[in-house]
Amino acid sequence: MLSVGATTTATRLTGWGRTAPSVANVLRTPDAEMIVKAVARVAESGGGRGAIARGLGRSYGDNAQNGGGLVIDMTPLNTIHSIDADTKLVDIDAGVNLDQLMKAALPFGLWVPVLPGTRQVTVGGAIACDIHGKNHHSAGSFGNHVRSMDLLTADGEIRHLTPTGEDAELFWATVGGNGLTGIIMRATIEMTPTSTAYFIADGDVTASLDETIALHSDGSEARYTYSSAWFDAISAPPKLGRAAVSRGRLATVEQLPAKLRSEPLKFDAPQLLTLPDVFPNGLANKYTFGPIGELWYRKSGTYRGKVQNLTQFYHPLDMFGEWNRAYGPAGFLQYQFVIPTEAVDEFKKIIGVIQASGHYSFLNVFKLFGPRNQAPLSFPIPGWNICVDFPIKDGLGKFVSELDRRVLEFGGRLYTAKDSRTTAETFHAMYPRVDEWISVRRKVDPLRVFASDMARRLELL
């Protein structure tokens, strides 16, 4: 492995799913100049196994791993340089995480414009994966809200990029580019104004997959800023696809109960506990998932105008630190795909295949995506987005390869932030602009200074 100084450590790394481990030399420093020098050493060596930036490791796949090479932990580079309530702009280092940003920005009446399923994500990672959230139909993905970024490229230069400037092509290749165009050092994000830290939520339950699809197709989505659903992927038809749908918008002060109005912008997102690493493999199965799913569905119910805090409405899993340990040391595979809106019958077939497979998932997300952005490798396209978590067991690899084939056949795609096993051939077929992206990448990094396990697997170098 390439040595870049005393602060590096050989470390076994995985994604959040705890699969596909590899060992890399990890550099962890708050010194931006040291990061620049480390990249220069990789370049001077001719690239070798290369370098890749890593944030909090919440990607489920291998995009922030670099076996035999250098991984640069960006979390110490975490200064919030400025917050401007008038322009709604924040100037922040790439290692700032969304939890930290939310706490700092709320007193200014500003909200993070796009939140994924956890706040434990760095800004650099949010850009590199072009994360999306419950408001994709109304706000798009994270890259839509980046007004500029400073990118350390393979030649040692730090380039200031904007979405419409001279280097716009490189800007959009970096959004969703999984860190392979360079290292995002700093960014300016346009935030969302808010008068409270709470949501006004409406809940609905559906009895079948057809009802779930109908609810998302009747035009009511446009009334809500945020929308997502848990759905049942275990029960046989007609219960298959039944859902607990949660939709809402940020609350105004007038909508809050009296006890909350004195501190409407108070950050209210409690964590209950951190799970110990004691759970055996196999505990997550049909017999545990089935009753939990039934309970979750029954307790959800129909409601209107409920005031909820950030954890209740958006991040229930953040109440449990290290919740991925519940799947045991073998881990789990999070499979996320999107199918074009018009291919609804094909989408329903895939859900049926998942239910009949013998591979069971409880933590299931259903979301109808809105318009896509300009980034060649950005995941969201208008369509039916599904995310399921499969415990690792025999036969899973063969099954998800068959799912890949169906998703591709129906015009869909997988999300790089959730994948550590699909093939280069499949990925390239799913992303028709991948050659355009590779061309941009090679212009700024002809020596392949920036590399990762994912990049080698998907032939992106």
From Swiss-Prot:
Gene3D superfamilies: 3.30.465.10. It catalyses: trans,octa-cis-decaprenylphospho-beta-D-ribofuranose + FAD + H(+) = trans,octa-cis-decaprenylphospho-beta-D-erythro-pentofuranosid-2-ulose + FADH2. Changing L368P: In strain: TRC12; Ty38c-resistant mutant strain lacking Rv3406, but sensitive to moxifloxacin. The keyword RNA-binding does not apply. GO terms for cellular component: periplasmic space; plasma membrane. Disruption phenotype: Traditional knockout mutant with dprE1 disruption could not be achieved, suggesting this gene is essential. Conditional knock-down mutant of dprE1 show that down-regulation of DprE1 results in rapid in vitro growth arrest, swelling of the bacteria, cell wall damage, stop of cell division or lysis, decreased survival in macrophages and virulence attenuation. Cells lacking this gene display impaired growth. Residues 19-194 form the FAD-binding PCMH-type domain. Its main location: periplasm. Changing G17C: In strain: TRC11; Ty38c-resistant mutant strain lacking Rv3406, but sensitive to moxifloxacin. Monomer. Although forming apparent dimer in crystals, DprE1 does not dimerize appreciably in solution. Interacts with DprE2 to form an epimerase complex. This is Decaprenylphosphoryl-beta-D-ribose oxidase.
